């Protein structure tokens, strides 16, 4: 990573010339670096990652969602160097800073689920994303190993028994949603996979709940607004991924995999 950061100034300068960018302040961290830029008087974002696979997968998903207004637009790319040029979103306030209503999130989820993904090369299955997340949690060592083991088994069973071909954002939470023109919600920073799109509902139904009754009400309310969403599957994903979510309520400890709701089970 140190060598990648050392090479960034030259790479940014090269891309700025190629794409006609006036480069402004930088931000981001973890797996990417993001630069606010101007092109032809409009704000655009230059996103760089040291892992070309991450950039390739993100670009693939953004192209698939290109006809929706609820996902940031992809303007250009150089996947060889892990570079994406993304459209600006104005005002661009992160949803976590402004608060949100379930009905608005439901409209975002409906848009994300409206795309039929039949492109090649194929994105990785959701089970791979789950394995990555639990491997990361294991390495960090901040959660109970038995809880992580049960959560991993439950999540992989959820992936195995659910839809295999839905386009999943994979990292959809209020930090990765911006407010666009007219209050429209715009998703950014996908870590996409193919599988059960109900996976993307978890953060929206867990946040702030204090007991299982409140969780079930919120899940039922969201499922009523999103065609094709299974309340039972969303509950299953909440339990299966709870060990990965900081501050998840204790009542969401993963249940044994054999008790998970089957794909398509009706809400109760």
Segments and roles (model prediction):
Residues 4-12, 117-170, 180-181, 223:
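An alpha-helical support segment within catalytic cores of ATP-dependent transferases
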Residues 4-39:
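ATP-binding glycine-rich phosphate-binding loop
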Residues 24-38, 74, 155-199:
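Active-site acidic catalytic loop and adjacent metal/ATP-binding pocket
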Residues 9, 42-85, 89-112:
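A conserved alpha-helical element in kinase catalytic cores
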Residues 51, 68, 80-99, 114-118, ...:
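A glycine-centered beta->alpha junction motif in the catalytic cores
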Residues 39-42, 79-81, 181-183, 239:
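Short strand-connecting beta-turns/loops that link adjacent beta-strands
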Residues 220-225, 233, 243-268:
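Helical subdomain adjoining the active site within ATP-dependent kinase catalytic cores
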Residues 179-224, 231:
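Active-site Asp-x-Gly
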